[in-house]
Amino acid sequence: MAQTCDLCGRGPAFGNRISHAHNVTKRRWNINLQSVRALVNGAGRRMRVCTSCIRNNKVQKVA
Protein backbone atom coordinates (compact mmCIF):
# COMPACT_ATOMS: atom_id res chain seq x y z
CA MET A 1 0.00 0.00 0.00
CA ALA A 2 1.21 3.52 -0.70
CA GLN A 3 2.65 5.76 2.03
CA THR A 4 3.37 2.97 4.52
CA CYS A 5 6.70 1.92 5.99
CA ASP A 6 7.83 -1.53 4.84
CA LEU A 7 9.36 -2.28 8.26
CA CYS A 8 6.99 -1.00 10.94
CA GLY A 9 3.80 -0.59 8.86
CA ARG A 10 3.32 2.99 9.97
CA GLY A 11 1.04 5.02 7.72
CA PRO A 12 -0.39 8.52 7.43
CA ALA A 13 -2.28 10.22 10.26
CA PHE A 14 -5.69 11.72 9.52
CA GLY A 15 -7.32 14.82 10.93
CA ASN A 16 -9.08 18.05 10.06
CA ARG A 17 -7.95 21.29 8.46
CA ILE A 18 -9.73 24.11 10.29
CA SER A 19 -9.91 27.63 8.85
CA HIS A 20 -10.36 30.88 10.76
CA ALA A 21 -14.08 30.72 9.97
CA HIS A 22 -14.01 27.20 11.49
CA ASN A 23 -14.77 25.46 8.21
CA VAL A 24 -13.60 21.86 8.57
CA THR A 25 -12.16 19.71 5.77
CA LYS A 26 -10.33 16.39 5.95
CA ARG A 27 -6.55 16.26 5.65
CA ARG A 28 -3.73 13.79 6.15
CA TRP A 29 -0.20 13.99 7.48
CA ASN A 30 2.07 11.74 5.43
CA ILE A 31 5.07 10.10 7.04
CA ASN A 32 8.60 10.82 5.85
CA LEU A 33 9.41 7.82 3.65
CA GLN A 34 12.84 7.29 2.12
CA SER A 35 13.83 4.75 -0.51
CA VAL A 36 16.68 2.67 0.96
CA ARG A 37 18.63 -0.36 -0.21
CA ALA A 38 18.53 -2.75 2.75
CA LEU A 39 19.72 -6.26 3.53
CA VAL A 40 16.80 -8.70 3.58
CA ASN A 41 17.64 -12.42 3.98
CA GLY A 42 21.23 -11.74 2.91
CA ALA A 43 20.28 -9.96 -0.33
CA GLY A 44 19.98 -6.27 -1.15
CA ARG A 45 16.44 -5.06 -1.67
CA ARG A 46 14.97 -1.60 -2.22
CA MET A 47 12.50 -0.68 0.52
CA ARG A 48 10.44 2.38 1.45
CA VAL A 49 11.29 3.00 5.10
CA CYS A 50 10.23 5.82 7.44
CA THR A 51 12.95 8.03 8.87
CA SER A 52 12.23 6.93 12.43
CA CYS A 53 13.16 3.34 11.48
CA ILE A 54 16.35 4.59 9.80
CA ARG A 55 17.23 6.74 12.82
CA ASN A 56 16.63 3.85 15.26
CA ASN A 57 18.82 1.46 13.19
CA LYS A 58 15.96 -0.93 12.43
CA VAL A 59 17.22 -1.23 8.84
CA GLN A 60 20.64 -2.55 7.82
CA LYS A 61 21.82 -0.63 4.76
CA VAL A 62 23.72 -2.23 1.87
CA ALA A 63 27.15 -0.67 1.32
From Swiss-Prot:
InterPro entries found in the cross-reference section: Bacterial_rp_bL28 (IPR050096), Ribosomal_bL28 (IPR026569), Ribosomal_bL28/bL31-like_sf (IPR034704), Ribosomal_bL28_bact-type (IPR001383), Ribosomal_bL28_sf (IPR037147)
Gene Ontology BP annotations: translation
CC terms in the record's Gene Ontology section: ribonucleoprotein complex; ribosome
Molecular function per GO: structural constituent of ribosome
Pfam families attached to this UniProt entry: Ribosomal_L28
Highest taxon of source: Bacteria
Keywords noted in UniProt: Ribonucleoprotein, Ribosomal protein
Protein family according to the UniProt entry: Belongs to the bacterial ribosomal protein bL28 family.
HAMAP family: Ribosomal_bL28
Protein name: Large ribosomal subunit protein bL28
Species the sequence originates in: Solibacter usitatus (strain Ellin6076)
